[in-house]
Regions:
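Conserved NAD+-utilizing ADP-ribose enzyme module
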Residues: 1-102
Length: 102
Protein backbone atom coordinates (compact mmCIF):
# COMPACT_ATOMS: atom_id res chain seq x y z
CA UNK A 1 0.00 0.00 0.00
CA UNK A 2 1.29 3.46 -0.91
CA UNK A 3 0.96 6.36 1.50
CA UNK A 4 0.88 9.94 0.34
CA UNK A 5 1.87 13.05 2.20
CA UNK A 6 -1.30 14.77 3.34
CA UNK A 7 0.29 18.03 4.53
CA UNK A 8 2.02 20.66 2.43
CA UNK A 9 5.79 20.76 2.36
CA UNK A 10 7.11 23.69 4.37
CA UNK A 11 8.21 26.64 2.29
CA UNK A 12 6.99 25.50 -1.11
CA UNK A 13 4.05 27.90 -1.11
CA UNK A 14 6.07 30.88 0.13
CA UNK A 15 7.46 33.27 -2.43
CA UNK A 16 9.40 36.49 -2.23
CA UNK A 17 8.25 39.53 -4.20
CA UNK A 18 10.21 40.46 -7.34
CA UNK A 19 10.94 43.90 -5.83
CA UNK A 20 12.02 44.37 -2.22
CA UNK A 21 12.90 47.22 0.12
CA UNK A 22 16.01 47.07 2.29
CA UNK A 23 17.58 49.48 4.76
CA UNK A 24 20.91 50.87 3.65
CA UNK A 25 23.37 53.09 5.51
CA UNK A 26 25.09 54.99 2.66
CA UNK A 27 27.95 56.38 4.76
CA UNK A 28 29.18 52.89 5.72
CA UNK A 29 27.59 50.81 2.92
CA UNK A 30 25.98 48.57 5.55
CA UNK A 31 22.52 47.06 5.45
CA UNK A 32 19.89 46.32 8.07
CA UNK A 33 19.95 42.70 9.17
CA UNK A 34 17.87 40.57 11.51
CA UNK A 35 18.37 37.47 13.67
CA UNK A 36 15.54 34.94 14.03
CA UNK A 37 15.75 31.48 15.62
CA UNK A 38 19.52 31.28 15.20
CA UNK A 39 19.52 32.47 11.57
CA UNK A 40 21.02 35.82 10.51
CA UNK A 41 19.70 37.48 7.38
CA UNK A 42 19.44 40.64 5.34
CA UNK A 43 16.21 42.34 6.44
CA UNK A 44 13.88 42.97 3.50
CA UNK A 45 10.29 44.08 3.10
CA UNK A 46 7.59 44.02 0.45
CA UNK A 47 6.71 47.66 1.17
CA UNK A 48 8.60 50.83 1.94
CA UNK A 49 6.31 51.38 4.93
CA UNK A 50 7.46 48.11 6.48
CA UNK A 51 11.09 49.10 6.00
CA UNK A 52 10.44 52.50 7.65
CA UNK A 53 8.76 50.84 10.66
CA UNK A 54 11.73 48.49 11.06
CA UNK A 55 14.15 51.44 10.86
CA UNK A 56 12.23 53.20 13.63
CA UNK A 57 12.23 50.02 15.73
CA UNK A 58 16.00 49.44 15.48
CA UNK A 59 16.58 53.17 16.06
CA UNK A 60 19.66 53.62 13.87
CA UNK A 61 20.13 57.05 12.38
CA UNK A 62 21.22 57.59 8.80
CA UNK A 63 19.41 54.57 7.37
CA UNK A 64 17.64 54.97 4.01
CA UNK A 65 15.26 52.64 2.22
CA UNK A 66 16.41 51.24 -1.07
CA UNK A 67 14.19 49.43 -3.59
CA UNK A 68 15.99 46.51 -5.22
CA UNK A 69 15.16 43.35 -7.14
CA UNK A 70 15.06 39.94 -5.49
CA UNK A 71 18.25 38.97 -7.36
CA UNK A 72 20.03 42.13 -6.16
CA UNK A 73 18.96 41.34 -2.59
CA UNK A 74 20.40 37.83 -2.93
CA UNK A 75 23.73 39.27 -4.11
CA UNK A 76 23.83 41.78 -1.26
CA UNK A 77 23.13 39.02 1.28
CA UNK A 78 25.86 36.82 -0.24
CA UNK A 79 28.33 39.72 -0.02
CA UNK A 80 27.63 40.31 3.68
CA UNK A 81 30.09 38.74 6.09
CA UNK A 82 29.11 35.72 8.13
CA UNK A 83 26.93 35.11 10.08
CA UNK A 84 24.51 36.52 7.44
CA UNK A 85 23.31 33.50 5.46
CA UNK A 86 19.87 34.48 4.18
CA UNK A 87 17.29 37.00 3.06
CA UNK A 88 14.53 37.54 5.60
CA UNK A 89 11.20 38.91 4.46
CA UNK A 90 10.04 40.66 7.63
CA UNK A 91 6.47 41.62 6.72
CA UNK A 92 5.54 39.48 9.76
CA UNK A 93 8.52 39.98 12.06
CA UNK A 94 7.46 37.10 14.34
CA UNK A 95 7.27 34.67 11.43
CA UNK A 96 9.71 35.82 8.72
CA UNK A 97 10.09 34.06 5.40
CA UNK A 98 13.68 32.91 5.07
CA UNK A 99 15.54 32.36 1.81
CA UNK A 100 19.01 30.90 2.34
CA UNK A 101 21.79 32.19 0.09
CA UNK A 102 24.60 30.04 1.53
Amino acid sequence: MTQTLSIPLIGLDETFPDELFVLHHPATDRYGCFHHDGVHGLACFSSETGAFRFAEWIDLSGMATKQISFDEAREIAKARPLPVVSLMLLDDIHNPQIHFVR
